[in-house]
Swiss-Prot record:
Species the sequence originates in: Rat coronavirus (strain 681)
Stated name of the protein: Non-structural protein 4
Family: Belongs to the coronaviruses ns4/ns4.8 protein family.
Top-level taxon of the source organism: Viruses
Cross-referenced Pfam families: Corona_NS4 (PF03905)
Amino acid sequence: MAALGHKAKLAAVFIGPFIVACMLGISLVYLYQLQVQIFHVNNTIRVTGKPATVSYTLSTPVTPVATTLDGTTYTLIRPTSSYTRVYLGKTRGFDTSTFGPKVLNYITSSKPHLNSGRPYTFRHMPKYMTPSATWRFGM
């Protein structure tokens, strides 16, 4: 170091770390821009004044229709609820003969048929034991 002189020593002590700091700063700025591009946070950093436009469509599902051979069309009704058990009143509790999830099929009449393999009727029961309806007329 003694052979280089005073100015060379000054350059080695101050200019060398300055060049290293500049290179480090440039690389950090480059990495920050790369991170902004990767994570798509450009719009959150530079907020523009453009109003946002929201586009949406209103669609109604097609109602299923059954047509008979003579040309009569019936609107098939799909109830939105499914039945897991049927309450038979205070004295009998819940019905266990058709236990399990009972999803209603498409029906054309006002009385639904549960999906347990046979029509579900309460005609054999006395009036006071007939449960309250779990379905509405016309569903």
